[in-house]
Amino acid sequence: IDSTTTKPIEYASVSLVDLEHNELVTGGLTDKNGILNITGIPLGKYVAVIEFIGYKKKEISPINLFPGEGSGIRYDLGQIKLSISAVNMEAVEVVGDESVFIQTIDKKIFNVGRDLSSSGGSGSDVLRKIPSVDVDIDGVVSIAGDANVTILVDGKRSGRTGSGRRGEVENIPASMIEKVEVITNPSAKYDPDGVGGIINIVLKRGVLDGFNGNISAMQGQYNQKNLNGNVNYRTDKLNLFTGANFRTGDRIGDGVRQFQYAYSNRTDSLFQNTSRTRTPDNLGFRIGGDYYPTKASTLGYTLDIAEHKELTEEEFYYTANTQDRALVDTEFHTTEHDDGQHIDHALTYENKFDSQEQLLKAYVSFSHEIDDVHEHGGSETEHHSVDRENETNAMEHNDNWTLSIDYEDEFRDNLAIEVGAKTTLRDFGTDLNYLGQEYENDYNEDIYAAYLVTRYDITDRFGLKVGVRLEQVETKAALGGPTEHDSTNIITKIFDDAIEQSPFDNPYSKVYPSAFLLYKLTENQNLQFGYSKKVNRPNRRTLSPFPRSTQDLTRLRNGNPYLRPEYSDVMELTFSSNSRKLNLNLSTSYKNTSDVIMWWDRDYVTFDSTTYELLTAGNAENSKSTNISGNIMYRPMPLASIMIWGYGWNSETSDKGESDFNGNSRGVGFGGRLTLNIPTVARLELSGNGRGKMKITTGTIPANFRVNLALQKSFLQNRLSVTAKINDIFDSGKFIIDTSNEVTNSITQESYTQYMYAERQRQKRNASIVLNYNFGKQQKRKWDRSNFSGRSGGMGGGGMDMDY
């Protein structure tokens, strides 16, 4: 019953958890009178967990169901009073035997748990299962169609995700991931990077009592192999954890690209057929620990080391039909060796001051990443004569220092402040050897930030949170090369032109405000409005004036060191409704972005009587976009769950000077998952995601989708499990694009219409078997430090405590 009104609570959840194995055994929902009768319970020792949305959880234990002793074989829980939670809700948790999906006021949390289709996979497989999140065939992560996403690991940037600000998740094993947090509109407390949102991947640190571990192995088609192991030891004062992983396998893909150039008096064409085999070998090791000087404080350290070796072999076949017949039936091949490693150090401290009112967090992290890429390429004409052979060797490094301190103080039940400061120092560099000549590209970015956020609950149902963040950014880029600029081809000409303009400096400061309003409609329905200012800073690829590829002269692309950051004003309205059986979340957002960074600045460069098309990043004038998204999770019975999500967007970009930038894009995305758990028999999971037909500024992208199937059988009291799965059942995970646009050659002033059709597939349908074995006590502590202050997140799991 309600502790205040004494009225019965309908649909309250009552779960019986086996204390010995810490497993959900049975449960149910109360009727309209608040009554529930559970029968057929196996004998044993249990804890009863009583929950309802908007109320504080209550546990009753121990319940000893043994004949002749303990509580007997019948047990009456009696009258249970639940207290209403405050307006600042912690989380709404959808509990079950399968992976747990948690919807809080400001973010979505996906606990990887026993997710089947991502078992033995990577971070990309995990993210594809999260509502409104997509990972395309190139590894680009987007939220509701927006690819300006910041990827974090344990709340910080990591070498595991690569040197780019957006990051890559393919190198993170799914077995190392505990949960994923998706934050679409965070407050001024957090970095403003990521107009589309923030994805925080939280790695496992060990939450089970005593000595525990896990070993898993995967074998699949195309020589796919995966071996992972995690071990942790936890006591009242200490938590030690370590993990290692190895992953390899061939990724076979192909593609076609067709161009037509329609002039007023003729039509030229170019056809390209591509085949590619990529074989990555990834090895990783992670070790760390948490020391608890008191019940309120934690001191932690983590060391993360990983290395990769990757071989990529590509073959391109060109057939050209042009006016001068300069290029006819050419075969082009490349071989790329990519060897790299990274090392991350993170030292963290947290103190809750023996209260629920104060919290101090601080951390220092250092990340070092190196990447050595050796590329060899050549081409042959239709007469099998060697037309061009060259080699490129690039050594890249990326160093990141991050220092942060955050303090929270809740002066009263309805008033709190958050204040903090953060320094981020980044140093990127590339040493490039091309045709025996040495070139250098160094880029430094230092960010100094401070913030203040205030939360005020006006009533039990209405609250607000306002904040401001100040940033000072210092950037500097410098290029170097041969003292004599003696260009030998179009590539060296682009190099020399960029070096002549070096160095490039762009210091700037900015204020980032945020404001959030929360209204609690009912005990299980909430309405929230949020506003924040975001930034998408140019990354290394969009800044570097050196060509991204020195092999394929038909697709020249380079960055622009004069790029300005793009700024967005983001407004979002969210409605959420949560009950034991049904959870609904709907949101709509509006973004107004200035100085949009795009890859559509088309220029023409002439060298040795040949004109080349060069695609460069540039700032468009303005972009306005609207977005709507929603997800539903329905549990018709305790052993089954259905999750469905969808999103759509519409964006319009304009620029007064560059017609290449003008245009409209829109599209929709969708996904879902069905989970069936038949006790003592098996678990079945069917999942899928995709996109509808997209319109972009220059054409269309046809619809595509992926469907995955997984079946798992457990043995030895759930310690051993065998999972069989098929990824992309219909082999439909392809990328197709069809474009047309009007082009004017700035050198010859000749106009034509360019038509392009392209189709690519990076990974074919594949099947695999995964073995997983858990050892040790496999039981959570009865008392958990993460619940000490009643706050969510914290350092224990690398989560981001977002409040609203």
Stretches found by the model and what they are:
Residues T4-T5, S13-V17, E51-I53, G70-L116, ...:
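Short, acidic, small-residue-rich periplasmic hinge/interaction motif at the N-terminus
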Residues L19-I35:
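Short, acidic Ser/Thr/Gly-rich low-complexity loop/linker segments typical of extracellular
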Residues Q79-I80, G123-S124, R165-E168, V182, ...:
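N-terminal periplasmic accessory domains that precede
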Residues G123, K129, K156-T184:
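Short acidic/polar hinge/loop motifs at secondary-structure boundaries
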Residues Q219, N223-D254, R266-E314, Q341-H345, ...:
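Transmembrane beta-barrel wall of Gram-negative outer-membrane proteins
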Residues N273, E391, N400-S404, E438, ...:
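Outer membrane beta-barrel strand-and-loop segments of large Gram-negative receptors
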Residues G284-H308, F332-P482, D486, K520, ...:
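Face-selective signature of the C-terminal outer-membrane beta-barrel domain
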Residues I370, D427, E474, G481-I494, ...:
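Surface-exposed extracellular loop regions of Gram-negative outer-membrane beta-barrel proteins
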